[in-house]
Design a protein with these regions (language model features):
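HotDog/MaoC-like acyl-thioester-processing domains
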Residues: 1-13, 94, 98-170
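Hot-dog-fold acyl-thioester-processing enzymes
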Residues: 1-88, 153-170
C-alpha cells in the first residue's frame, strides 16, 4: 500500500470515502492489549471460558482494541500526515463481535469540513468510521473530529522556514 503524505485539509470533500487495507486481529494482539490496558476480564484471558461460556463461543477482542487498530489503519493511509490535533471521538457503537483471527478494514467517509475559526490555516474534519469484518459485517462505527493543516500557499514558509513546494509539509 502506498502512503500519500500530500493530503491537506483542502483535499478532503464531504462525501468522500476512503477504504483502508485489511488487518487480521491476532491472539497476540489480544494478549498484548489486555496486558497493557489491565482489562483482565475472563472472557479475554481464559480460552476455555470463552469457548464454553461467552456469548460468542470464542475469544472476543475488546472493542477498544478494535478502535485503536482501526485508527492505525487509517493513519497508515497517510491522510492524517498534516493532522494537528485529534479533537474528538463520538457516537461509538459496537454492533458485532470481533474474534481472534478476524480480519477488519475501515471505510472512512467525510461528513463535514469547515475552516477553523480559532486556528488560521487549519480546517476541521468530521469523519464517520465503519469497521467491517472479513464478511462485510459492520462491527464498530464511530465519528472522529480532527484539525488538519490547510495546503500552504507558495509564498507561505514551511516548518523549516523555506518557501512551500507542492507536497511540502506546512
Amino acid at each position: 500500500m502506498s502512503v500519500d503524505h500530500t493530503w491537506y485539509f483542502d483535499d478532503f470533500e464531504v462525501g468522500q470515502v476512503h477504504t483502508t487495507m485489511g488487518r487480521t486481529v491476532t491472539e497476540t494482539d489480544l494478549v498484548n492489549f489486555v496486558t497493557f490496558s489491565g482489562i483482565f476480564e475472563e472472557v479475554f484471558i481464559n480460552a476455555e471460558y470463552a469457548k464454553s461460556s461467552s456469548l460468542f463461543k470464542g475469544r472476543a477482542v475488546p472493542g477498544l482494541l478494535i478502535v485503536v487498530v482501526a485508527e492505525g489503519l487509517y493513519v497508515q493511509t497517510g491522510h492524517t500526515h498534516h493532522g494537528r490535533a485529534y479533537l474528538g471521538l463520538d457516537e461509538l457503537r459496537l454492533s458485532a463481535p470481533v474474534l481472534c483471527d478476524d480480519t477488519i478494514h475501515v471505510e472512512v467517509s467525510v461528513e463535514s469540513a469547515r475552516l477553523s475559526r480559532s486556528r488560521p490555516g487549519h480546517g476541521i474534519l468530521a469523519m464517520r468510521h465503519r469497521v467491517l469484518n472479513q464478511n462485510g459485517v459492520e462491527v464498530i462505527s464511530y465519528k472522529t473530529t480532527r484539525l488538519l493543516a490547510c495546503r500552504p500557499s507558495p509564498e507561505q514558509p514551511t516548518r523549516d522556514g523555506q518557501p512551500a513546494r507542492d507536497g511540502a509539509p506546512a
